[in-house]
From Swiss-Prot:
It comes from the Eukaryota. The gene is CAMP. Proteolytically cleaved by proteinase PRTN3 into antibacterial peptide LL-37. Proteolytically cleaved by cathepsin CTSG and neutrophil elastase ELANE. After secretion onto the skin surface, the CAMP gene product is processed by a serine protease-dependent mechanism into multiple novel antimicrobial peptides distinct from and shorter than cathelicidin LL-37. These peptides show enhanced antimicrobial action, acquiring the ability to kill skin pathogens such as S.aureus, E.coli and C.albicans. These peptides have lost the ability to stimulate CXCL8/IL8 release from keratinocytes. The peptides act synergistically, killing bacteria at lower concentrations when present together, and maintain activity at increased salt condition. The lineage of its organism: Eukaryota, Metazoa, Chordata, Craniata, Vertebrata. The keyword Oxidoreductase does not apply. Antimicrobial protein that is an integral component of the innate immune system. Binds to bacterial lipopolysaccharides (LPS). Acts via neutrophil N-formyl peptide receptors to enhance the release of CXCL2. Postsecretory processing generates multiple cathelicidin antimicrobial peptides with various lengths which act as a topical antimicrobial defense in sweat on skin. The unprocessed precursor form, cathelicidin antimicrobial peptide, inhibits the growth of Gram-negative E.coli and E.aerogenes with efficiencies comparable to that of the mature peptide LL-37 (in vitro). Residues 31-131 form a propeptide. GO terms for cellular component: extracellular space; vesicle. Residues 150-162 are annotated as: Active core. Its main location: secreted. GO terms for molecular function: lipopolysaccharide binding. It is found in: Secreted; Vesicle. This is Cathelicidin antimicrobial peptide.
């Protein structure tokens, strides 16, 4: 007596289900974006929402922070974009556009998810405030050098007068 477990069609279906089980994780992995790809998608969204005349393109991507492996968890990002010569009205990838000379630079921060299916981001951009911070750093370092230089000069003057001995007449 043959049971339905002995039928050849059940064996084929079992094989198909087994293969599907092996292939599905690969399909899920293929939907995960790289950190840079997620940022580029966010820039596309920024360009779509922007009221500026020209497209923006990635200028600098800050180093990727240490992250967990969950592609659905929002990942912090920080990057700068610069205005290109391409008008927003044309259907062109910003990567194909040259940067505009003296184009506006914006500093963007927020979060992105690496799950391509969710494709979510929360980014806000502002004029590049890091330049002001960098200027502050330069001024602070210059001030520190000036203080060290003045201390050095003061020490030399002190040493000079310390070496002078009064002359005695004989």
């Amino acid at each position: 007596m043959n049971t339905q477990w002995d039928s050849p069609s059940l064996g084929r279906w079992s094989l198909v289900l087994l293969l599907l089980g092996l292939v599905m994780p690969l399909a899920i992995v293929a939907q995960v974006l790289s950190y840079q790809e997620a940022v580029l998608r966010a820039i596309d969204g920024i360009n779509q929402r922007s009221s500026d005349a020209n497209l923006y393109r990635l200028l600098d991507l800050d180093p990727r922070p240490t992250m967990d492996g969950d592609p659905d968890t929002p990942k912090p990002v920080s990057f700068t974009v610069k205005e290109t010569v391409c008008p927003r009205t044309i259907q062109r990838s910003p990567e194909e556009c040259d940067f505009r000379e003296d184009g506006l630079v914006k500093w963007c921060v927020g979060t992105v998810t690496l799950n391509q299916a969710k494709d979510s981001f929360d980014i806000s951009c502002d004029k590049d405030k890091r330049k002001v911070a960098q200027l502050g750093d330069v001024l602070q370092k210059a001030g520190e050098k000036i203080v060290r230089g003045l201390k050095n000069i003061g020490q030399r003057i002190k040493d000079f007068f310390g070496k002078l001995t009064p002359r005695t007449e004989s």
